[in-house]
């Protein structure tokens, strides 16, 4: 015997759920494609995630809103399901919009606590600039403290000597890479962080420099 035909309300709820999942699923696919070097960062992040997935998430809100109206006309249970889907769709859309706005902020990509004599980082384009409110710890940090600070800020230590610690950090999502160096001198410890990309990053480079300085001060 043939199964019962789906009601308009049920079909609307299903459509809303599919639409709500489309944006996040595309973003996940974009991350995987960038990680596999199948597409460029510009294609995966700027196009697929911050434009197409964002547009899909906004469209999902519209679909979920229409679905809620149809579902409530069918039954209370389907209406509640559609309402829950709408709430999720609004949350996802808001998250995409927030991320797009943050990533559009053009923060500095080469920052240091010593503008007169920044710690050296190979192939850094420069010039280094200061981050607002971030200043060098006016003390000579121990090598162990500097290494701990690197790890606390999410950097993998790539080189260490008596007066210098180097590290590299690769973002977990789209692989945005930063290099950092902590230079130890009598009476002062300086930090430099350089982004290995040329794009707006919402101030991520300054945030990492702040994390390093805060960790150095906490480890004194």
Predicted regions and their residues:
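Membrane-anchoring/interfacial helices and their immediately flanking loops
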Residues: 1-38
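Ser/Thr-rich, low-complexity intrinsically disordered terminal regions
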Residues: 3, 28-53, 57-60, 64-80, ...
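Interfacial segments of alpha-helical transmembrane regions
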Residues: 11-18, 75-90
